[in-house]
Amino acid sequence: MYHDVSYLLSRLINGPLSLRQIYFASSNGPVPDLAYQVDFPRLEIVLEGEFIDTGAGAALVPGDVLYVPAGGWNFPQWQAPATTFSVLFGKQQLGFSVVQWDGKQYQNLAKQHVARRGPRIGSFLLQTLNEMQMQSQEQQTARLIVTSLLSHCRDLLGSQIQTASRSQALFEAIRDYIDERYAS
């Protein structure tokens, strides 16, 4: 399987990798000692293999998605080889990673970051997905929200804005000032 982040996003959005079941991780109760817990929302998408997640209370298979809200936790029980695609929604950037468990150890297959800029589309989609936790049986709607969120991620990856360094920005500002006031 090819592990380029943009390619994976496109395959999840347009096929042939289709989203199946959307699960919602636990965000209440005591957190197990080795559980994964971060302050940002994230998606865990199974690409290959299968694993049981205590936080979701289910066995996840290819195409299944686990949504972990900010402050929530998940606790995967790796019993056979599996490959997952994770999207972490930080305040300033998105983080993408593809991780494989081969039955003995983890291997990072891909890792990428992109700045969260522009309209707050992603924030509103995450808020909508948070609301879906109360109606987790509405799977068609949950799949469409996750697909929209993945599409937004692909849009951000495709239009990465290059930010000039501070010295470059200062140089350009001085040059523009001189051009505006002293050019003849």
Regions found by a protein language model. Give the residues of each.
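Short, conserved loop/turn and helix-capping segments at secondary-structure boundaries
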Residues: 40, 81, 165-168
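Hydrophobic/aromatic-rich alpha-helical bundle segments in the mid-to-C-terminal region
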Residues: 32-34, 57, 137-139, 160-164
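Hydrophobic alpha-helical core bundles mediating ligand binding, dimerization, or RNAP-core interactions
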Residues: 44, 125-132, 142, 146-154, ...
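Short, locally clustered residues in the helix-turn-helix/winged-helix DNA-binding domain
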Residues: 47, 154, 179-183
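A hydrophobic/aromatic-rich effector-binding and dimerization subdomain
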Residues: 1-23, 65-137, 150-158
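Broad gene-expression machinery/nucleic-acid interaction feature
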Residues: 42, 84, 184
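A short, Lys/Arg-enriched amphipathic alpha-helix from helix-turn-helix/homeodomain DNA-binding modules
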Residues: 118-122, 142-146, 162-184
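Generic protein-terminus/edge-of-domain signal
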Residues: 1-60, 78
